[in-house]
Amino acid sequence: MGQKVHPIGIRLGVVKKHNANWYASPKQYSEYLINDIQVREYLRKKLDSAMISKIMIERPTGAAKITIATARPGIVIGKKGEDIERLQKELTKIMGVPAQVNIEEITSPDLDAHLVAEGIASQLERRVMFRRAMKRAVQNSMRSGAKGIKVELSGRLGGAEIARTEWYREGRVPLHTLRADIDYSSVRAETTYGTIGVKVWIFRGEILDGMNSVYNPVKEEQTRAPKRRGRGNGNRRNTDRG
């Protein structure tokens, strides 16, 4: 039976970057990991309406740097930067070191898999027909410039007695091509009939010309001998006399 690998996990170090960049001793590793989870849960709960996609955490010596990718930066920053200053103080308490918060604006929310999945989940919770929510999300993403998109819903769709899985795809979604820039996310929608799982894959184009260009290798010199031209077969006179 075939199994599917995580589309982002298999591309880490190739065309994708880790959401947490830090080094720790074996004794500190679990402490840092739990602390990262606490920070992410706190930010997603506090900034629920800010349309947050990713939270990147870096830990330079004696400090912490948190980058929040959001489609609504104004909600995070607040009036005259008051909200972001308050946020930095709270994160400093949680992490135990001075925390710096940076905001990264998402200019195309329809090309971000997490925001698309959250949008579908919120529509399902408002009792919008699941097929309409799927097709609307697919059309908006393709209109925004996506090369391909796939949406999959699992659960008691439409309040059915038996749970099932339905999916809708448009364009190309090459999961086996490592140079393909594929964004993926899974979100849960809590409906009156139970939990519905929402998965979204978005293909945004290829990043690299070839796999070797990731490591910037030295180009191999041409070792083949140059081709020899013939002895002017094309310049021979036509001596046939008819």
Swiss-Prot record:
GO terms for cellular component: cytosolic small ribosomal subunit. GO terms for biological process: translation. This is Small ribosomal subunit protein uS3. NCBIfam families: rpsC_bact. Part of the 30S ribosomal subunit. Forms a tight complex with proteins S10 and S14. InterPro entries: KH_dom, KH_dom-like_a/b, KH_dom_type_2, KH_sf_prok-type, Ribosomal_S3_C_sf, Ribosomal_uS3_bac-typ, Ribosomal_uS3_C, Ribosomal_uS3_CS. Gene3D superfamilies: 3.30.300.20, Ribosomal protein S3, C-terminal domain. Belongs to the universal ribosomal protein uS3 family. Binds the lower part of the 30S subunit head. Binds mRNA in the 70S ribosome, positioning it for translation. Residues 39-107 form the KH type-2 domain. PANTHER family: 30S/40S RIBOSOMAL PROTEIN S3 (PTHR11760), SMALL RIBOSOMAL SUBUNIT PROTEIN US3C (PTHR11760:SF19). Pfam families: KH_2 (PF07650), Ribosomal_S3_C (PF00189). GO terms for molecular function: mRNA binding; rRNA binding; structural constituent of ribosome. Transmembrane segments: none annotated. Residues 218-242 are annotated as: Disordered. It comes from Psychrobacter cryohalolentis (strain ATCC BAA-1226 / DSM 17306 / VKM B-2378 / K5).
